[in-house]
Amino acid sequence: MAKPPVRKPKKKVCAFCKDKTQYVDYKDTNMLRKFISDRGKIRARRVTGNCTQHQRDVATAVKNSREMALLPYTSTAR
């Protein structure tokens, strides 16, 4: 018996490229929380759908935001 064809997952579109955003702001914590897991880790590019450059910008912004104490380094749940 032949296996049914496997569907390819839909390619995610970079949210920053779609909105034509030039700068990822480290002070915008509501936006940055979308790119952080519930454990406080930065989500992977294949999960978020960001392009390479914007994923780097998000990682830098999250790290700056953590340094400025706007975002936690880890989650509070234990």
From Swiss-Prot:
Coiled-coil regions listed: none
NCBIfam families xref list: S18
InterPro entries, per database record: Ribosomal_bS18 (IPR001648), Ribosomal_bS18_CS (IPR018275), Ribosomal_bS18_sf (IPR036870)
Keyword Repressor attached: no
Single biological process term from Gene Ontology: translation
Family: Belongs to the bacterial ribosomal protein bS18 family.
Purpose of the protein: Binds as a heterodimer with protein bS6 to the central domain of the 16S rRNA, where it helps stabilize the platform of the 30S subunit.
GO molecular function ontology, one term from the record: small ribosomal subunit rRNA binding
Pfam family, one: Ribosomal_S18
Organism per entry: Streptomyces griseus subsp. griseus (strain JCM 4626 / CBS 651.72 / NBRC 13350 / KCC S-0626 / ISP 5235)
Keyword rRNA-binding: yes
Protein name: Small ribosomal subunit protein bS18B
Keywords: Ribonucleoprotein, Ribosomal protein, RNA-binding, rRNA-binding
Quaternary state and interactors: Part of the 30S ribosomal subunit. Forms a tight heterodimer with protein bS6.
A single Gene Ontology CC term: cytosolic small ribosomal subunit
